[in-house]
């Protein structure tokens, strides 16, 4: 039994739904809060968490009046308590408090804590059978099989909250699993879509951060420039929808209007279109199984005029190839891929390596891990976190060597 409901056969919900937002002060969290703000009669906030933006978190808490608020940094607990003095809102700090927030009895949980730190809180929500809007990549990239099995066992409902997987989720409902031929994830191509390989190699941080369509944080914008983000999305799609690598294609689509497509055995291709606005897929998750009115601009195809598509270049963007390789390898390779990429992106942002060295560091880390013989199925969150930790350590150790080769 899948934890992702590919057929909408549930009745709509008229009652007020209780909501928890993990990562409320991040970009996904802010979009979620914006949607909640627009429909106070439909939603009641149970708990909110944030990383280190205590004042932003406190402001949201005063507005939405949740029962519990938690900040990830334990050293900020007193600051949070002071900011919420007189409200009667319970406060917590640290990993245990974030997990406590996720475990509270909310109908719907937005899992938007970034990084490996988001895995255990998401599992806490899953274990009580909640509906979880999943915006944390690491839950799937680092522990996909384990995470989805646990969700199915608990009777949890996993709704993909990012634009591409939400598009596939919507399109897949048009047919049955045995009728599926492939899914197609679209990619903008990023700022270097038309650049020569030699120019991509030397790209600066400022150039990498000039995404043509989306407004995102630094790390994901760099991932978009390298197409590592699309590699991560291929991995996520495989675990979310139980697809083999051969059933997942990537298509470059510079306008970012078509977010995902599904081809069925009768050769019909069903696509989901929308403006590049994260509130659209989040609204779909928030309203599911109904649809709710959202604040996003309506799509005007006549104004856009032209939609174009092209094949991805695995030579200029080797990070995409490495994602497919790690997915086929399995047994923790996707965890290594993600961890090494995070180390590489941080090194590039700090000026330690060239842009082109990001993929080389990821590949070197994967090769080192393969030679180590430490591959084994993941059976717990701690297994995934241990592989993630070891891969980061390996990547950091290989960093001087990769940097020297590029100089």
Curated annotation (Swiss-Prot):
SUPFAM superfamilies: 1-deoxy-D-xylulose-5-phosphate reductoisomerase, C-terminal domain, Glyceraldehyde-3-phosphate dehydrogenase-like, C-terminal domain, NAD(P)-binding Rossmann-fold domains
Cofactor(s) of this protein: Mg(2+); Mn(2+)
Residues the entry annotates as binding NADPH: 25-28, 53, 136, 138, 217
Any one Gene Ontology molecular-function term assigned to this protein's record: NADPH binding
UniProt-listed Pfam families: DXP_redisom_C, DXP_reductoisom, DXPR_C
Keywords: Isoprene biosynthesis, Manganese, Metal-binding, NADP, Oxidoreductase
Residues annotated as binding 1-deoxy-D-xylulose 5-phosphate: 137, 163-164, 188, 211, 224, 229-230, 233
EC numbers: 1.1.1.267
Positions contributing to Mn(2+) binding: 162, 164, 233
Reaction(s) this enzyme catalyzes, per UniProt: 2-C-methyl-D-erythritol 4-phosphate + NADP(+) = 1-deoxy-D-xylulose 5-phosphate + NADPH + H(+)
Pathway annotation from the record: Isoprenoid biosynthesis; isopentenyl diphosphate biosynthesis via DXP pathway; isopentenyl diphosphate from 1-deoxy-D-xylulose 5-phosphate: step 1/6
Gene3D superfamilies associated with the record: 1.10.1740.10, NAD(P)-binding Rossmann-like Domain
Any one GO BP annotation for this protein: isopentenyl diphosphate biosynthetic process, methylerythritol 4-phosphate pathway involved in terpenoid biosynthetic process
NCBIfam families xref list: Dxr
HAMAP family listed in its UniProt record: DXP_reductoisom (MF_00183)
Protein family according to the UniProt entry: Belongs to the DXR family.
Role, per record: Catalyzes the NADPH-dependent rearrangement and reduction of 1-deoxy-D-xylulose-5-phosphate (DXP) to 2-C-methyl-D-erythritol 4-phosphate (MEP).
Protein name: 1-deoxy-D-xylulose 5-phosphate reductoisomerase
């Amino acid at each position: 039994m899948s934890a992702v409901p590919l057929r909408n056969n549930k009745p709509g919900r008229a009652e007020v739904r209780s909501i928890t937002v993990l990562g409320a002060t991040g970009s996904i969290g802010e979009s979620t809060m914006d949607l909640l703000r627009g429909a106070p009669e439909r939603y009641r906030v149970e708990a909110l968490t944030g990383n280190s933006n205590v004042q932003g978190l406190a402001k949201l808490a005063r507005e939405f009046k949740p029962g519990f608020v938690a900040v990830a940094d334990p050293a900020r607990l007193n600051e949070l308590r002071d900011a919420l003095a007189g409200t009667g809102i319970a406060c917590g700090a640290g990993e245990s408090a974030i997990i406590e927030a996720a475990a509270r009895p909310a109908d719907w949980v937005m899992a938007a804590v970034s990084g490996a730190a988001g895995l255990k809180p998401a599992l806490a929500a899953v274990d009580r059978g909640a509906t979880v809007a999943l915006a944390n990549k690491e839950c799937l990239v680092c522990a996909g099989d384990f995470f989805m099995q646990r969700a199915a066992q608990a009777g949890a409902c996993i709704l993909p909250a990012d634009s591409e997987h939400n598009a596939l989720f919507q399109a897949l409902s048009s047919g049955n699993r045995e009728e599926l031929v492939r899914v197609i994830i679209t990619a903008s191509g990023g700022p270097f879509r038309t650049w020569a390989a030699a120019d991509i190699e030397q790209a600066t941080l400022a150039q990498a951060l000039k995404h043509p369509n989306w407004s995102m944080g630094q790390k994901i914008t760099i991932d978009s420039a390298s197409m590592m983000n699309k590699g991560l999305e291929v991995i996520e799609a495989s675990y979310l929808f139980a697809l083999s690598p051969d059933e997942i294609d990537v298509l470059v689509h510079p306008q970012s209007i078509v977010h995902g497509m599904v081809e069925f055995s009768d050769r019909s291709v069903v696509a989901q279109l929308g403006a590049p606005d994260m509130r659209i897929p989040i609204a779909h998750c928030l309203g599911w199984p109904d649809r709710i009115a959202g604040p996003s601009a309506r799509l005007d195809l006549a104004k856009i005029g032209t939609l174009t598509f092209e094949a991805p270049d695995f030579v200029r963007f080797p990070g995409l190839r490495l994602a497919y390789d790690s997915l086929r390898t399995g047994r923790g390779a996707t965890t290594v891929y993600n961890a090494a990429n995070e180390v590489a992106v941080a090194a590039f942002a700090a000026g330690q390596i060239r842009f082109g060295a990001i993929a080389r560091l990821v590949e070197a880390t994967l090769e080192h891990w393969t030679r180590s013989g430490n591959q084994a199925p993941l059976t717990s969150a701690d297994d995934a976190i241990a592989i993630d930790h070891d891969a980061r350590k390996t990547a950091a150790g290989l960093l001087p060597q990769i940097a020297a080769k590029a100089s």
